[in-house]
């Protein structure tokens, strides 16, 4: 059985998956996914605004809200896509430990999307957006968590 650790560094507009095969082995990039939809704003996605309503009595007006913002929906879909890849890797026994690194809101999306079996492999999480930094700088943020 391997002792590999997978480190997922993700944000709404992309993700990188690294593997560490043990102390002194460093980080190996497994994949890099660009998700450009994650950069869009609600106004870019929502052309059909919910509209307004009027009080049945009086002169009040209220905006109607949609159930979920389009950007939140896209983030959830991307988190589910990443979760499927993590499940596949677990099913293939490619790793035994998992570290999640993401900005806090997207980290919540990832946790919600993970299966219970995959979530049980999480050894640490970092609630920071480190998606844009170089791998050699990333290792400085992981030294207390993974022996690289």
Which positions does each model-derived feature cover?
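Terminal alpha-helical anchor/extension segments at protein ends
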Residues: 1-148
């Amino acid at each position: 059985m391997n002792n590999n650790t997978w480190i997922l560094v993700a944000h709404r507009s992309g993700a990188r998956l690294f593997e560490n095969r043990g102390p002194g082995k460093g980080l190996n990039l497994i994949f890099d996914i660009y998700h450009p939809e994650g950069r869009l704003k609600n106004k870019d996605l929502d052309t059909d605004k919910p509209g307004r309503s009027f009080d049945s009595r009086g002169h009040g007006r209220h905006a109607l809200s949609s159930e979920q913002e389009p950007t939140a929906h896209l983030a959830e879909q991307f988190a589910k896509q990443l979760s499927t890849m993590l499940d596949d890797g677990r099913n293939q026994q490619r790793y035994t430990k998992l570290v999640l690194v993401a900005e806090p809101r997207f980290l919540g999306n990832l946790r919600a999307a993970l299966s219970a079996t995959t979530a049980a492999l999480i050894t640490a999480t970092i609630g920071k957006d480190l998606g844009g930094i170089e791998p050699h700088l990333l290792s400085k943020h992981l030294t207390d968590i993974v022996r690289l």
